[in-house]
């Protein structure tokens, strides 16, 4: 095999590779002989088919197979012998494919950069932390109690007020004709509550028990029933009972109803849940600070195609948000060229940080264990109730899908390693300070 380097520009490399015709013929003959051993044709005993007939019948398909095998093996050998580390699958272009002559093809690839790791021990960070206050725990308990409210009759005679619940019968009509799904009996409706079409529950305010009222509403344009979307409708409402939502007293009995031994145990669990939420924010903030610090020390060149692929993924989301008028406030008012330039910088930063973290992990032996992958697969499967086994089967049958789980786990383990090596000082602050003016949504 003869290899000639044709391009060496930054991380880009190009080669012309020639494989002798004798090597090709040896492979082809060997493959045809393997076929002949098992080939069964009428008039011939198994394994006794003449080679000329084998070539006539299977020569073309064997040539294709041998060519693909030769190119792949030659490319892998060239990459290995030269100690190259491709960032992506090499691009191959066939130049001469006549198997009776030397096969010639071109290989283009982009290399992973040589990365000099920063002194992780010199990285200094402040990790903001917060602890749940008694007030935060009380508020969380009140929210739990609100979700456990019971409806009780209102004893006084008065019209329905905002926040009350009316038990009603109703009949809905469009163009004077009742429509399917527009009739209800003994339904409890919260006055000005959510979950109804606009104006439905709001117009029940002021109704008294025994009173009937006709209200006019318009179904939203995006309503789930196409026949009703955007159409005006009338509902005849009859009020049958007035109720109010009463939250339970937060005491030991309340905790017992939730399956716990005491209010003290409930407070303990709620406190830990809040602490976990605070710790997640703390983790995201210190991770962002760490990545900012590493980015300042990551001045190496990055493979252009990796950046382009990352940018295309980002831009697909940004462009959809732009067209739907969902851009962040910071991006509104920017023209497309400016947005593209901004997000290309983000893409380059992400690729650079990803390569740096990967190299830190490689050099320091960070690995993702099978038990971690299994936990991740189970966690992903739990997001699809009733389809858990199908999700697990999908992962087992698709190694690339498993790799999509491996990447985030690996990244977090490398971050953990760096945080253990770096100088990290913990600073306790209020939850308001922990949450203040900080984008912790990603690594960009």
UniProtKB/Swiss-Prot annotation:
Q: Which Pfam families match?
A: FKBP_C, Trigger_C, Trigger_N
Task: Please state the protein's primary subcellular location.
Answer: cytoplasm
Q: Which domain of life is it from?
A: Bacteria
* Protein location: Cytoplasm
Q: Does the keyword Chaperone apply?
A: yes
The catalytic activity of this protein is classed by the Enzyme Commission as 5.2.1.8
**Catalysed reaction equations from the record:** [protein]-peptidylproline (omega=180) = [protein]-peptidylproline (omega=0)
Q: Which HAMAP family does this UniProt record tie to the protein?
A: Trigger_factor_Tig
| Annotated protein name in UniProt | Trigger factor
Single annotated GO MF: peptidyl-prolyl cis-trans isomerase activity
Give the record's family classification. Answer: Belongs to the FKBP-type PPIase family. Tig subfamily.
Q: Name one GO cellular component term.
A: cytoplasm
Q: What is known of its domains?
A: Consists of 3 domains; the N-terminus binds the ribosome, the middle domain has PPIase activity, while the C-terminus has intrinsic chaperone activity on its own.
What is this enzyme's class at the first EC digit? isomerase
Q: List, alphabetically, the InterPro entries matched.
A: PPIase_dom_sf, PPIase_FKBP_dom, Trig_fac, Trigger_fac_C, Trigger_fac_C_sf, Trigger_fac_ribosome-bd_bac, Trigger_fac_ribosome-bd_sf, Trigger_fact/SurA_dom_sf
Record's keyword annotation contains Cell cycle: yes
Q: Which keywords has UniProt assigned to this entry?
A: Cell cycle, Cell division, Chaperone, Cytoplasm, Isomerase, Rotamase
Instruction: Supply one GO BP term.
Output: protein unfolding
């Amino acid at each position: 095999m003869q290899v000639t380097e044709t391009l060496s520009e930054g991380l880009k490399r190009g080669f012309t590779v020639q494989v002798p015709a004798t090597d090709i013929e040896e492979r082809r003959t060997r493959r045809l002989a393997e076929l002949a051993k098992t080939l069964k044709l009428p008039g011939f005993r198994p394994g006794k088919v003449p080679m000329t007939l084998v070539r006539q019948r299977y020569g073309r398909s064997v040539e294709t197979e041998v060519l693909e095998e030769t190119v792949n093996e030659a490319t892998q050998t060239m990459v290995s012998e030269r100690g190259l580390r491709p960032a992506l699958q090499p691009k191959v272009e066939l130049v001469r494919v006549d198997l009776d002559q030397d096969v010639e093809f071109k290989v283009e690839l982009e290399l992973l950069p040589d990365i000099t790791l920063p002194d992780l021990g010199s990285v200094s960070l402040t990790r903001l932390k917060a602890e749940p206050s008694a007030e935060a725990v009380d508020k969380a308990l009140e929210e739990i109690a609100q979700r456990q409210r019971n409806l009780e009759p209102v004893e006084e005679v008065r019209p329905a007020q905002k926040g009350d619940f009316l038990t009603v019968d109703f009949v809905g009509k469009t163009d004077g004709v009742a429509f399917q799904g527009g009739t209800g009996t003994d339904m409890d409706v919260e006055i000005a509550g959510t979950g109804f079409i606009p104006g439905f529950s709001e117009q029940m305010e002021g109704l008294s028990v025994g009173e009937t009222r006709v209200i006019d509403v318009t179904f939203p344009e995006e309503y789930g029933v196409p026949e009703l979307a955007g159409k005006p409708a009338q509902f005849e409402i009859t009020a049958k009972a007035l109720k109010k939502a009463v939250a339970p007293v937060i005491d030991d009995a309340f905790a017992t109803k939730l399956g716990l031994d005491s209010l003290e145990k409930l407070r303990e669990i709620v406190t830990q849940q809040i602490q976990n939420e605070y710790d997640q924010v703390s983790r995201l903030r210190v991770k962002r600070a760490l990545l900012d610090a590493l980015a300042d020390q990551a001045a190496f060149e990055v493979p252009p195609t990796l950046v382009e692929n990352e940018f295309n993924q980002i831009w697909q989301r940004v462009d959809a948000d732009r067209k739907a008028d969902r851009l962040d406030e910071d991006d509104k008012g920017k023209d497309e060229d400016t947005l593209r330039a901004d997000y290309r910088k983000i893409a380059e930063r992400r690729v650079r940080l990803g390569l740096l973290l990967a190299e830190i992990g490689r050099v320091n032996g960070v690995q993702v264990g099978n038990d971690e992958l299994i936990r991740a697969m189970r966690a992903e499967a739990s997001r699809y109730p009733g389809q858990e086994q199908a999700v697990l089967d999908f992962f087992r049958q698709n190694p690339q899908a498993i790799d999509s789980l491996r990447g985030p786990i690996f990244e977090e383990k490398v971050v953990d390693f760096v945080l253990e090596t770096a100088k990290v000082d913990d600073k306790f602050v209020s939850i308001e300070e922990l949450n203040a003016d900080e984008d912790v949504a990603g690594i960009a």
